[in-house]
Amino acid sequence: MSNVNEIVAGYIAAWNEADGGRRRDIIARTWSDDGSYLDSHRDSTGHAAIDAMIAAVQERFPGYRFRLCSGIEAHHNRVRFSWSAGGTDHAPLFFGGTDFVALAADGRMQAVTGFTDAMPSVG
C-alpha cells in the first residue's frame, strides 16, 4: 500500500483545485485508471468522469474549500476519513461527510463511496 496520508491529501487537493489541468494531474496520481466515486448524488467512473464531477461540484458551490476533519483510519486496502466543505467569506455554509476508499494494488484509489451529510441549497 502506498502512503495513505498522501493519497487522502491528493484526494482533498483534487476537490480544491480549480485549474482543470492541475486537477487532472492530481486525479491521475491518486486514482486508478478505472477508479470510481459513488454517493447519493453522483456515480462517476474513470478519470474524465471524476474530473467532470468535481468541476460540477465546484461550479455549484463556488468558493468552497474541502478539508480533512478527522484522522485517517486504514487497514488492508481500505481507508476511512471525514471531511467538511465551505467556510470562506462567499461560502459560509458548511457541509461534510465520510468517505470509504478501497485502494487498488498500486496504492491509488480504486473506489470511493461517500456518505454526505445534509447539503445546503445553493441558487
Feature roles, as predicted:
Residues 96-123:
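Short beta-strand edge/turn micro-motifs at domain boundaries
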Residues 48, 91-92, 120-123:
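A short, polar/proline- and glycine-enriched secondary-structure boundary/capping micro-motif
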Residues 1-6, 119-123:
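Basic/polar N-terminal segments that are highly enriched at the extreme N-terminus
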Residues 4-5, 22-77:
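A solvent-exposed, acidic/Ser-Thr-rich amphipathic alpha-helical stretch
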Residues 63-65, 93-96:
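Short solvent-exposed loop/turn micro-motifs enriched in small/polar/acidic residues
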